[in-house]
């Protein structure tokens, strides 16, 4: 059994790796297909350890993402907090689903996240990027089963 301190260290390390994977510069053609690793990580911890992960983790990770790449401070923090809240609220239902159905729910969560960021960008007068920004939802849903397996391995249990 893992202590709370050990769990928080693992959550922080996986969130840091996800943040690095999210802000790592890639060629444009590959950047369009990059899954939202940070959102997937926050979703995983919010679903599997709602007390250790969750809204606070979503807010902190979103704030760090805003510092690195957000045009408006707080937009990713708000979007990740809302997605984490929904994941914590529905964590028992989501955990009981098979991987394919979880991927569909993750697709919906990623689409909601992108919509919130899209809406904030529009309200603040920042130019709306191309429709290719929605590909993150599809690639995130495809990557969810292996990502969840890797994160569950880091948690010390098998998927």
State what each model feature region is.
Residues 1-159:
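Terminal, non-globular segments
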């Amino acid at each position: 059994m893992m202590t709370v301190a050990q769990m928080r260290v693992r959550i922080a390390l996986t969130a840091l790796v996800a943040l690095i994977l999210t802000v790592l510069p890639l060629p444009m053609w590959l950047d369009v297909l990059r899954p939202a690793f940070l959102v997937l990580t926050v979703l995983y911890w919010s679903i599997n350890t709602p007390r250790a992960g969750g809204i606070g983790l979503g807010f902190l990770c979103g704030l760090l993402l805003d510092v690195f790449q957000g045009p408006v401070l707080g937009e990713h923090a708000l979007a990740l907090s809302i997605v984490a809240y929904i994941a914590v609220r529905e964590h028992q239902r989501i955990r009981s689903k098979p991987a394919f159905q979880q991927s569909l729910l993750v697709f919906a969560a990623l689409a909601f996240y992108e919509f919130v960021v899209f809406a904030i960008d529009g309200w603040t007068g920042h130019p709306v990027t191309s429709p290719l920004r929605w590909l993150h939802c599809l690639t995130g849903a495809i990557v969810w089963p292996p990502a969840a397996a890797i994160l569950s391995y880091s948690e010390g249990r098998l998927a």
